Amino acid sequence: MDIRARTKIIDIYSNLKYKKPLKSFQKILTTSDSDNCEDFFNIGLNIDKNKITAIGFDGDGCIISTIATELSIKAIENKTINQAKKILSDLIATYKDKNSANQVVEELKLLIEMNVTEKRLQCLLLTPSNLLQWFKNF
């Protein structure tokens, strides 16, 4: 990862815009992972007419999972559920197969640049995977 990407990651982590109290949200999703990951986030959502009108998170995680949560939330805010599913599916598919033809939205390209190891992949995909599963069951 180049210095530009590292600087951007530190800047985002130091200025999380979507980390906030979740009292005003209609729905709360708690992330979970079957491995020994201790990272967890609560994702607050307001959905109106199948569109994500407001979204935020609280909780704690490593820098990778926190950045992935912040950027995933930014990417799906003001999108329909179907648009959010596509955005998250494309991210997951691209990360698992770098030769994938899927297009990753601009907000999530930094996650691809992070080039994490297999062990840290669960950190990066914690929130996107949980959100995608929740939207599939919506």
Curated annotation (Swiss-Prot):
Gene3D superfamilies: 3.90.1010.10. GO terms for biological process: iron-sulfur cluster assembly. One of its GO terms (molecular function) is iron ion binding. InterPro entries: NIF_FeS_clus_asmbl_NifU_N. This is Uncharacterized protein MG337. It comes from Mycoplasma genitalium (strain ATCC 33530 / DSM 19775 / NCTC 10195 / G37).
